[in-house]
């Protein structure tokens, strides 16, 4: 039976498209072994990012998953999951176009460049597809 891990951002981060994945996750349980984890932190400090990476690696090391699906904004996890079949859902890149300077460079590295390491990328809209181009 296929094993799938869904990774969700921390629940305190406000509205999350992750709620859309819950019914999908439940339906998939009919055909696959499905687990999910929530990130322990919602901040983007180095320490918080490191905590999220460790939590994700711990889950992946505990069981061999066929697919790891990052459902939210934690694209920065992808390079730390090399060797895994990572699917990521991109919601939008709106924030990227609103920031400047060093923040924009860091956002590009953590959120956009990281996508190059994903096995597959899904987008919630054609608008998001165009943003990625």
What would you call each of these model-derived segments?
Residues 118-133:
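A short, active-site helix/loop in glycosyltransferases that binds the activated sugar's phosphate group
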Residues 10, 73-74, 92-94, 127:
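Short, flexible active-site-adjacent loop segments at beta-strand->alpha-helix junctions, enriched
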Residues 16, 77-80, 98-99, 132-133:
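Short glycine-/acidic-enriched loop or helix-start segments at secondary-structure transitions
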Residues 3-78:
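Active-site donor-binding segments of glycosyltransferases and PAPS-dependent sulfotransferases
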Residues 103-121:
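Membrane-proximal helix-turn-helix segments that form the acceptor-binding/catalytic region
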Residues 32, 65, 83-84, 118:
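Short, well-ordered alpha-helix to beta-strand connector turns
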Residues 67-69, 80-99:
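Active-site proximal beta-strand in glycosyltransferases
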């Amino acid at each position: 039976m296929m094993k799938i891990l869904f990774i969700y951002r921390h629940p305190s981060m406000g509205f999350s498209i992750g709620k859309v994945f819950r019914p999908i996750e439940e339906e998939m349980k009919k055909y696959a072994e499905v687990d999910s984890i929530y990130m322990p932190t919602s901040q983007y400090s180095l320490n918080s990012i490191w905590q999220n990476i460790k939590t994700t690696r711990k889950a992946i090391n505990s069981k061999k998953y066929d697919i790891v699906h990052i459902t939210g904004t934690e694209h920065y996890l992808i390079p730390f999951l090399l060797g895994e079949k990572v699917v990521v859902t991109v919601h939008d890149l709106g924030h990227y176009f609103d920031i400047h300077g060093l923040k924009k460079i860091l956002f590009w590295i953590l959120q956009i460049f990281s996508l190059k390491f994903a096995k597959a990328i899904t987008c919630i809209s054609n608008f998001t597809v165009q943003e990625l181009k």
